[in-house]
Amino acid sequence: MTIWDQPKENSLAALLHGMQIADGIEFDLRISSDGDFVVYHNELVPGEGDKSERSIERMSTSELRSLGIATFDELLSQRVLTDVWQAGGKTANIEFKVPHPAARIDDVDAHLSAMMGLLEESLVPFDLPARSALVYSFSPRIGSVAKSVGFEFPVTRLSPYLRPWGSYRIKRLVGTPGFVLSTVTGLIKEHREEGMPAVAMALQYLQGWERFAHPGTPMAISGGGLERLNRARAGM
């Protein structure tokens, strides 16, 4: 019996596998110092050097590729992925990652705008079916920037807000107040008022004891809680 060797997260192998066996994939995009998209989650590459030198946005595409980081162009060159994406029935959830402060990118709006322009340039030629790509970010500016530039793809904001730097635990510790003080109903209302077609939220809003940690009527992914959720999000 062959043992499946799980591919590395955000690798070409993982994304190609996911697009073939599932109804879609999720991946993270950052921009290199050369202005190219790279598929990478963390804000820094591993190492002991200065954080500014390890920030993805301050590294060249060739440097990042030498570390095994795939570019978005490499992903789009894979017909096994793009053919099924164009055929319909598959969705790609694309997260725009906000740079680490060490990258010294102060104008987040301009950075998001550049990412949107580059994504359109990359994907529009594929003439993807409607609702086959959703872009989201933890940045609270994602919606307003998308409107200001007339972005062609639907966007939504990830909740609760997590800052773009720090360890996994620190990020979640800082995000805890926002989680506790928000409600599923409130998030749905906010996203709807901003014209967002979907609500992207942490699973803890709907599952486990954490769903009782914030005010409002608890919702869930099954039973009566799911019925309440479906009523609240009708049309989204």
Language-model segments: what does each one mean?
Residues 1-236:
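Phosphate-group recognition and catalysis centered on beta-loop-alpha active-site segments
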